Amino acid sequence: MSSIKPIIGISTNEITNFGGRQISHSTGLRYVNAVAKFANGIPILIPSYIKDEDLDQLLKKLDGLVLTGGRANVEPHHFGGDPFPPDEPIDVGRDEIVLKLIPKCVNLGVPIFGICRGIQEMNVAYGGTLHYRVHLIPDKNDHRMPRGDDVTVKEIFTLRHRIDFTKNGFFSRLINNDSCMVNSLHGQAIDSLAQNLKIEAYSDDGVIEAISIPEHPSFAVGVQWHAEYEPEKNELNKSLFMEFGKACLNYINKK
């Protein structure tokens, strides 16, 4: 095994504490652990506020990029949607930096793995649109996580619905199954797919659950479920991070 490990950037979310007196940029430990243990990478958190002129220099240091989930949805002005209600959480800084990083990564060949909000950002970055509230669409399931003071972490991340993989697509090369069960913790989802993207999986109610960017030379995959949850127990999630890690290592060798 090579002693060189890929440096993998992980997007962060803006968190406000102490009544607005303290703002931090953070990400869940599960993403960090999955990158370190299953992608065999060195995880580096990327704060939301980086100057445009510094993005290219940042990418010279990265061998991969993970786009994490987040409480805030992508603001609709980025895809021509109706404004959010005033109480909807937003993350202006993350929208700005991630939507610029995605096409830059594709152009350079930096591997990208988008999770939950990440798949939505990949779609918006290339001109696609999003549903604001999937559960309000006729014949669609409620994809949001269960809520309540007594809801456990296990219940939040339980396998909720089936997804079907696109025939002869990315997942046919990754695992030996045509379908799989996944967790579901999102209210927003892909509406119109960007022209540059390819659908890799649907949920059983027709919601797009996985995509790829075919023009990327190695790995540019987004999934709507939370693949960072217990990859040590879930073969699909484990395989995704391992394949992403291989692509990141290959990127080092091609620099």
Which functions belong to the PLM regions below?
Residues 221-224:
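Active-site-proximal beta-strand elements of phosphoester/diester hydrolases
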Residues 1-113, 124-131, 135-174, 181, ...:
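N-terminal beta1-alpha1 cap of cysteine-dependent amidohydrolase-like domains
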Residues 119:
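The feature captures the ABC ATPase H-loop/switch
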